[in-house]
């Protein structure tokens, strides 16, 4: 394929937290390795990428680096009082997450973008779904990892206060803008079939304009590990302890397992909220649960190799990187019945009802007691590992979509 000039658009690209910055890094470097010229236009936090990739900062006020109202007002005072800045502040101050709403407007005000916009062959948006002009949307591909409507609905389900529910709805009101803006996009990339289905449902977007491409994942350091001794060591990975990660039901299942007279330990990789720390104490699980904050890659792999069974319990994931990593190391896994997990796990895992701690307990018990089943799932994990691919192959799949956009066949 000929060398393309590609603009990656991302309203924020934190390299250390959440998936968006990691996605931008991996995609941009894979496209660079494929011989393309890549420029990233991003709000803060900026991505950390290969020095051959040009990164252009799109100015954003930084209101969401703090949740202190006085600090936000000070940020506003330091801004030029343009119509855009005033509108952004009012929306922020009244509880809306505004970064994706106004990213498109701020991009158009960026001097570097104004000078170079016409030179790009294709624009690739990373879930900003902002209000881009026709000059961009006619050459635009958007990656939509999953509909954030799901996060909103789960947050609402886990909140009892009427006022807090109103606040949650206000925060997620940017979704109304995104639904309108997505209709102008020629092609959407979804990381799983389940996410594609939900994009159609929540955004009322045409199914035939959504391409499913599993995310690339670097498995070079996730070697298949043959386990010998079995010690009932379970492991789960959470990027952040939010209700969607469903940690509460994992802890309840461990408690039920203990009451059934079975001994098992759980390692939680990630940050813990106080509510779940308290739940561990209240259930008398302190001696059975250990938790590690975000770890260097090598330490993460060591813990996976020292574990016997992995649990991926989220109520929703557009694509579960931790699940794939567990499968790649040969762990038998237990996964929730929601979203992409059954699709990714294939026959390498058991499936439980995500809102049923007793069902999870039964699956844990089954794997503890059934050595032959553990061996079967571990062998299936070894086979399933080959279904996943790296970011260079992902870039090749992107090239096919870019060619469709450029040739006008979409």
Task: Describe the predicted segments one by one.
Residues 42-105:
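A conserved catalytic-core segment of Leloir-type glycosyltransferases
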Residues 277-301:
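Nucleotide-activated donor-binding/catalytic signature segment of Leloir-type glycosyltransferases, i.e.
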Residues 194, 216:
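Carbohydrate-associated surface elements
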Residues 315:
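Aromatic "clamp/platform" in nucleotide-sugar-dependent glycosyltransferases that forms part
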Residues 228-245, 251-254:
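Conserved donor-binding/catalytic core segment of Leloir-type glycosyltransferases
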Residues 332-335:
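Short hydrophobic beta-strand element within catalytic cores of glycosyltransferases
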Residues 350-357, 366-372:
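Conserved acidic donor-binding segment of nucleotide-sugar-dependent glycosyltransferases
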Residues 72-95, 137-179:
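Acceptor-binding helix/loop patch of EC 2.4 sugar-transfer enzymes
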């Amino acid at each position: 394929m000929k060398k393309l000039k590609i603009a990656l658009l991302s309203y924020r690209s934190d390299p250390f937290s959440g998936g968006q910055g990691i996605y931008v890094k991996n995609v941009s470097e894979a496209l660079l390795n494929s011989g393309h010229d890549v420029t990233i236009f991003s709000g803060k936090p900026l991505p950390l990428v290969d020095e051959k990739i040009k990164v252009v900062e799109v100015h954003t006020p930084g209101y969401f680096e703090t949740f202190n109202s006085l600090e936000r007002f000070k940020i506003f005072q330091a801004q030029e009082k343009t119509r855009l800045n005033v509108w952004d502040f009012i929306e922020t101050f009244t509880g809306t997450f505004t970064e994706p709403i106004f990213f498109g407007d701020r991009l158009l005000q960026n001097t570097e973008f104004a000078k170079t916009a016409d030179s790009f062959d294709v624009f690739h948006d990373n879930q900003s779904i902002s209000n881009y002009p026709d000059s961009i949307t006619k050459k635009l591909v958007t990656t939509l990892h999953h509909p954030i409507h799901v996060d909103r609905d789960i947050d609402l389900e886990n909140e009892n206060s009427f006022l807090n529910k109103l606040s949650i709805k206000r925060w997620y009101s940017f979704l109304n803008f995104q639904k309108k803006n997505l209709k102008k996009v020629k092609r959407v990339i979804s990381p799983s079939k389940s996410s594609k289905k939900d994009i159609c449902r929540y955004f009322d977007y045409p199914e035939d304009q959504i391409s499913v491409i599993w995310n690339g994942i670097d498995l070079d350091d996730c070697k298949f590990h043959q386990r010998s001794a079995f010690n009932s060591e379970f492991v789960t990975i959470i990027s952040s302890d939010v209700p969607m990660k469903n940690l509460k039901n994992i802890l309840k299942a461990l408690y039920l397992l203990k009451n059934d007279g079975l001994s098992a330990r759980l390692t939680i990789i990630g940050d813990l909220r106080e509510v779940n720390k308290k739940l561990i104490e209240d259930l008398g699980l302190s001696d059975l649960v250990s938790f590690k904050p975000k770890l260097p890659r090598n330490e993460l792999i060591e813990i996976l190799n020292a574990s016997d069974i992995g649990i991926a319990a989220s109520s929703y994931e557009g694509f579960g990187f931790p699940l794939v990593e567990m499968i790649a190391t040969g762990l038998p896994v237990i996964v929730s019945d929601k979203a992409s997990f059954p699709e990714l796990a294939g026959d390498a895992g058991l499936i439980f009802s995500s809102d049923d701690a007793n069902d999870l307990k039964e699956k844990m018990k089954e794997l503890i007691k059934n050595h032959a089943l553990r061996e079967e799932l571990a062998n299936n994990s070894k086979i399933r590992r080959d279904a996943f691919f790296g970011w260079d192959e992902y870039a090749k799949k992107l090239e096919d979509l870019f060619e469709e956009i450029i040739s006008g066949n979409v």
